[in-house]
């Protein structure tokens, strides 16, 4: 019975590892494509009219890439839940971490999906008219959507909850001796760097707010690396953290 239970635990752990790796890759690949074809994420802080024009020129390929960016990270949802289930024996905060992590992923997905289902309509209205009133209405609608779904939901709440999840899980996995301290600190440090990118969001409403331009790119890249390494460890380790 013990052997069967152990085998089930190890199988669940390997599944979790593959979900982490596939989810991280699913985020990284469309992110990289968007940085090449749409100057993402720098484009987010350009003038609304410029963003709408560039988006329209990107056509269906750009819309599809944004959809992939929103959806291909979905394997992280069950991965977070499986990690949380395994971590509950080691921390009373595991359920809270899972709730925050899953919520963060969902609100980021909602924010990203605006580029697939709402922005195409606004860019079409903006580009295909010479009426200043229609252009102004499109810009106003886009600006409101951009600030709410993008800055508030996706970039602030989504990233903040993800950062908190990463720090909590790093501490729990270190406590469980699942991986070495350097891996735990990689998760924590990448999260703290990622947290500094929140300054860019405040700068959208507080002119002159100090911003470290590299924080978002560096923090998110280190976070993806941490996810992938954690996934590899879960696949390769012969012992779990039960």
What are these model-predicted stretches?
Residues 7-242:
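Hydrophobic, aromatic-enriched alpha-helical segments typical of multi-pass transmembrane helices
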């Amino acid at each position: 019975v013990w052997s069967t239970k152990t085998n089930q635990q190890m199988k669940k752990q390997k599944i979790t590892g593959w979900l982490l790796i596939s989810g991280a890759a699913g985020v990284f690949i469309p992110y990289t494509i968007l940085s090449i074809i749409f100057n993402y994420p720098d484009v987010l802080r350009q003038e609304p009219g410029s963003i709408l024009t560039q988006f329209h020129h990107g056509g269906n390929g750009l819309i599809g890439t944004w959809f992939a960016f929103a959806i291909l990270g979905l394997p992280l949802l069950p991965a977070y839940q499986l990690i949380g289930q395994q971590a509950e024996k080691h921390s009373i905060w595991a359920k809270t971490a899972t709730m925050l992590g899953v919520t963060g992923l969902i609100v980021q997905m909602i924010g990203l999906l605006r580029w697939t289902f709402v922005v195409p309509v606004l860019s079409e209205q903006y580009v295909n008219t010479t009426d200043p009133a229609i252009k102004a209405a499109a810009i106003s609608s886009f600006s409101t959507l951009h600030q709410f779904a993008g800055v508030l939901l996706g970039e602030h709440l989504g990233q903040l909850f993800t950062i908190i999840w990463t720090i909590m899980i790093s501490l729990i996995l270190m406590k469980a001796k699942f991986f070495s301290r350097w891996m735990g600190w990689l998760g924590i440090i990448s999260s703290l760097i990622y947290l500094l990118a929140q300054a860019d969001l405040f700068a959208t409403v507080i002119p002159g707010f100090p911003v470290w331009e590299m924080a978002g790119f560096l923090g998110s890249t280190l976070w993806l690396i941490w996810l992938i390494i954690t996934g590899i460890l879960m696949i390769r380790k012969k012992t779990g953290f039960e």
